[in-house]
Swiss-Prot record:
This is Endoribonuclease YbeY. Belongs to the endoribonuclease YbeY family. It is an enzyme of class 3 (hydrolase). It comes from Clostridium botulinum (strain Loch Maree / Type A3). Transmembrane segments: none annotated. It comes from the Bacteria. One of its GO terms (molecular function) is metalloendopeptidase activity. Its main location: cytoplasm. It is found in: Cytoplasm. The keyword Metal-binding applies. Keywords: Cytoplasm, Endonuclease, Hydrolase, Metal-binding, Nuclease, Ribosome biogenesis, rRNA processing, Zinc. The keyword Nuclease applies. Zn(2+) binds at residues 132, 136, 142. InterPro entries: MetalPrtase_cat_dom_sf_prd, YbeY, YbeY_CS.
Amino acid sequence: MIYIDNRQNKIKVDEEFENKIKEIIDYALKEEKVNIDYEISVIFIDNNSIKEINKDYRNIDKATDVLSFPMLDYEEGEVFKDVYLNYEFDESDLDEGNLVLGDIALSLEKAEEQSKEFGHSFLRETCYLTIHSVLHLLGYDHMEEDEKAIMRQREEEILKSFNLHR
């Protein structure tokens, strides 16, 4: 189950766009071998809102593109398919039978700015940021160079296999 809540009014969001975001989330999860019913919440916000969240949770007082709030715990270097592939989840991890993976806060305003900066479509940028965030929910990180290389490779592989190119 994917919940989308549009809390901004700077970028037009229609059902087709929301469905594409749901499709890329589902696709990325399948690519990462998530073989259980799941729940992810996505909020679309603007730069001011994501700046506030970034300051509150990361103590960084500036707008960013996307923030991820994973609900599962991972040791450094471990990802979902390494730890939870055949795991028996406790009821506390589930909501009405769905594994709660976490929340995504995506600034559509920042995504639009970046799509222009990088010279590709808004859809490609939002799909990339969504994949990036989903991978964070699954334990990927980019704080260390080796982790960053692995995460970037997975992002590009998923984008290409989903037929979204730069």
